[in-house]
Regions:
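Short, Lys/Arg-enriched N-terminal segments with co-localized hydrophobic residues
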Residues: 10-21
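Charged/polar low-complexity intrinsically disordered segments
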Residues: 4-7
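Positively charged, polar, low-complexity stretches
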Residues: 71-95
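Structural motif
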Residues: 35-38, 62-67, 76, 101-104, ...
Length: 181
């Protein structure tokens, strides 16, 4: 094994900085009643305004809040939206996560599927961690420099495999809400 590692240029990571360490925590997110959350990573101060324009023009009836955390300069949480309660909930969520260059959107009267593609196509957006109404935990790493999101726990673990009856129920539901003919 050692020879393989040596031949393939794998080297053990030895950190000369004794202070370097990483703590992991799971932050439980309190999603407002009747809302979906979209949580993602972004990189530029105009994110909040661009995401506002995307949602407002894609789903005009949507109620939403948006917040974005800067990762340099004043490191402020920037917020936009058309519902003050959802804006405040986004700010509270990002304060509890504490990571830079993250955005949070709470969406009501619309589903994430309505806005995800335009959000992913926004030049500032680097990635989407989740789009869900399920119970949510955010896995956060903290170092001396700051915090970052490693991933999310979206909902619960699988309990089984879909049966024919489950499949029929799923298909009926999608037609009932207008997503299939």
């Amino acid at each position: 094994m050692e020879q393989f590692l040596r031949e393939n240029h794998y080297r053990p990571v030895i950190n000369p900085n004794e202070e370097a360490r990483m703590d992991l925590t799971a932050v439980t997110v309190d999603i407002p009643e009747g809302c979906n959350i979209i949580l993602g990573q972004t990189h530029f101060i105009k994110t909040a305004e661009d995401l506002y324009e995307i949602i407002a023009t894609t789903v005009p009836q949507a109620k939403f809040g948006i917040a974005f955390t800067e990762a340099s300069g004043p490191c402020l949480i920037r917020a936009e939206g058309n519902d003050e309660g959802l804006i405040n909930a986004c700010v509270k969520t990002l304060q509890s996560i504490g990571a830079g260059h993250v955005f949070c959107i709470y969406l009501k009267n619309a589903f994430p599927v309505n806005v995800l593609t335009p959000i992913k196509n926004c030049p500032e957006v680097c990635r989407i961690f989740c789009a869900t109404a399920n119970p949510l935990e955010v896995v956060v790493a903290a170092t001396a420099q700051g915090k970052g999101i490693l991933g999310v726990i979206d909902g619960f673990s699988p309990k089984g495999v879909e049966t024919q009856a489950d499949r029929a129920q799923r298909r009926e539901f999608l037609r009932k809400i207008g997503y299939k003919l």
